[in-house]
Amino acid sequence: MADELDVVDIEGDECDEIVGDLSSAEILQDQYLQSAWRTNSSVLPWTLDSSISDENRQVIESMLLEEQYYFASKKAPKVAWTNEKTKVKKPLVKSSAAQTRWAEEEKELFEKGLAQFGRRWTKIAKLIGTRTVLQVKSYAKQYFKNKPKAEPAAEVTSANVTSVSSIQPHVSALTNAVRIERLSDDEDVDITDDFSDSELQSKKQPERSVSPDCNHHGELRPSLSDALLHLPSESTAADGQADPDFSEDTEIHHSEIDSEAVEESGNPFINLDSPSKHSLTGEEETELADKCESAECLEEEVEDQEEDEEEELRAPEQEVELDLNTITEEEKQAISEFFEGRPSKTPERYLKIRNYILDQWRRSKPKYLNKTSVRPGLKNCGDVNCIGRIHTYLELIGAINFNCDQAIYNRPRLVDRSRLKESKDSLEAYHLAQRLQSMRTRKRRIRDVWGNWCDAKDLEGQTYEHLSAEELAIRREEMKKKGPRPSKLPKQRGSFDPFQLIPCKTFGEERQEPYSVIVCAEALIVMDIHAHVSMGEVIGLLGGTYEEEDKVLKICSAEPCNSLSTGLQCEMDPVSQTQASEVLGVKGLSVVGWYHSHPAFDPNPSLRDIDTQAKYQSYFSRGGAPFIGMIVSPYNPSNSSPQSQSTCLLVQEEPGPSGSHKFPYQFNMQCSAEPPDWSEVMRRAEWVVFKYRLCHGSVPMDRLFRRDSSLTCLEKMLLSIRTVLERLSEVDIETFLVQLESLFNTHFLSETGSSSTHLYETATQPQLLSFLSSEPISSSATEETSDGHDEPNTTGPDKLEQSCVEEEHDETVMQSTSAETV
């Protein structure tokens, strides 16, 4: 019995089925065939005649082997013909097709991975484990190519199923289409060829031919091979009747196979009585293989043409109106980066960018809206690339730049041919998203005859003038006489000097003083001493109180600060700022202003001073507190008086034809008759002396401050301070001035190489202080002279809260100059 055999031969015997009733014609005899040749479709009956000579036998054998290799792509068997009837067990050797055959488990994993990962072949290959990425892609290509063919085949009418199942021998033929026998676990099953056994053909009944799909690889289509593998194993080759336990599903599978075979063969009924009508000769096999290959090539070409046609995107026929409050599904697919849960790219941000671009298009319509024009209004909304992609998407769908000549709808893109063929809307959105990955193709720009850039279309239809060398030279001379072409570089603004001095305006009837300013003598003395000792600008803070009801600002104290040089300007040292603020806070005073010096020019603010003052005012006005600025000019050449010049100012904005401008306004400040705290004044004077005595930018206090004066800088400073203290008692004034002069003579002049003898020589042979001009000292000169401590300054209010460092003090000097001696 066939069901008791130990060998499974499911390749089928093609020659048995094709030959038909050859056994009855006494042409095909088993003793002439060995099992190795039984599966060869190219073996014909006449090749087995024993009367053929050995020489002809070898020629025919070689021809058959070559023909077999060409059509079946199998290794030719090396078994020779013999008249002995030997039953040899067919060795189960894997062919090239068998090596790529997929098991059911692998197919299930492939479908599972396809549903989970899509067309990510690398992940699917990792999921399967036994297949490479190339094998997965190759199988997927056949899978998707045959899938649409298998689905229509399943739609078989019930009438056809009934008519097919009603024929008893037909079921038996299908059950024997593949010989199912018991196998051991370690044996392979080759399902390359599936044909019915020759034992069934002796019944001489008209049946439909069961043939596999044409494939130049020699493999079955997955759906057909699956159907054959699901046939019941109880069927045998010798059994001519249908299995009573045959299920309805199996019949449906059979009908699918038959219907597909009928469609491909074109002849639903084949008479097995005439072998010449249904047997495949070599020419027919060649023709059949050529048809299969040409059909597959044609199908691939059609698919390629379809994909190429899909790449072309037509221009929108009408303008699209988008709802400003909703986001469509097409937008989510095309601009998916904003809908992936990223914290920096949210749907709200996409809506903001899209609506802004749409709004700009409505304003500029019908003028073309480019990407550059929308970027300034979308700051902090993402990188320019994502804004550009949204712009391109809106242009492609016709939401913006509709009917504009500059709009470009067909852009080059990378075609992903492995993508699933989804619905029309999804496919269009996918193509649209692919186009967004490529940048806009720029129009070609060329130079005209004058060398200027222009569009290539502008030069169309022009005739070029061919000039000789002499004419060209004359033309160039004429162009030179006309003058050079204006430069296309952006025009520079008018010369902007940050150190340009701006005269202060005065308050009057049109603009009254916002409050009155009273300055105590203590603050004026400290500012005057600090400004006299340095050739560069010095800087400090002002402390005082503000009476809101009376609108009176009283400046009670001045705290000198260090300065930091940045090459072009100097700023207040944040450490020293913080220290000065804390000292004023301990006294119960608030920071109500700042001061700096103009050593050798007018006490008018520069453009940079105005900007700094405006920043301070903006910072301190948040709490409702006023903030003023003071400028002290000790060595102004235009001032012949020994008294230093000072200005108290405030910056206010005024509207103008080109916008609002900031102008400085000068207060009419009043001096307070309140006596200063002498100990605090001497403390700050000591800080100034020990700070600047070794600085390169310190003023030599023993030199004359003017050519037409006999006063030294120290004497000039003492006279200026005396003028401030003229309302106080003479005793207090003299005591303080003697103490101050002693401090400078002992610790300032001695450290700079001065002595009493030198002072005497200075009086007899005066040396002038080297202030070159009335303009501000340049930054380079300031760095060279003041060692980076005193320069033109600007200070930011944001640095008032940093830490501070105290200067070193000489304890013996502090004791000798204490307030007790005064």
UniProtKB/Swiss-Prot annotation:
A motif (JAMM motif) lies at residues 596-609. Residues 189-221, 235-267, 775-822 are annotated as: Disordered. Keywords: Activator, Chromatin regulator, DNA-binding, Hydrolase, Metal-binding, Metalloprotease, Nucleus, Protease, Transcription, Transcription regulation, Ubl conjugation pathway, Zinc. GO terms for biological process: chromatin remodeling; cranial skeletal system development; positive regulation of transcription by RNA polymerase II; proteolysis. InterPro entries: Homeodomain-like_sf, JAMM/MPN+_dom, JAMM_MPN+_peptidase_M67A, MPN, Myb_dom, SANT/Myb, SANT_dom, SWIRM. Its main location: nucleus. Zn(2+) binds at residues 596, 598, 609. GO terms for cellular component: nucleus. Residues 313-411 form the SWIRM domain. Residues 517-651 form the MPN domain. It comes from the Eukaryota. The keyword Metal-binding applies. SUPFAM superfamilies: Homeodomain-like, JAB1/MPN domain. The keyword Nucleus applies. SMART domains: JAB_MPN, SANT. It is found in: Nucleus. Belongs to the peptidase M67A family. MYSM1 subfamily. PANTHER family: EUKARYOTIC TRANSLATION INITIATION FACTOR 3 -RELATED. This is Histone H2A deubiquitinase MYSM1. The lineage of its organism: Eukaryota, Metazoa, Chordata, Craniata, Vertebrata.
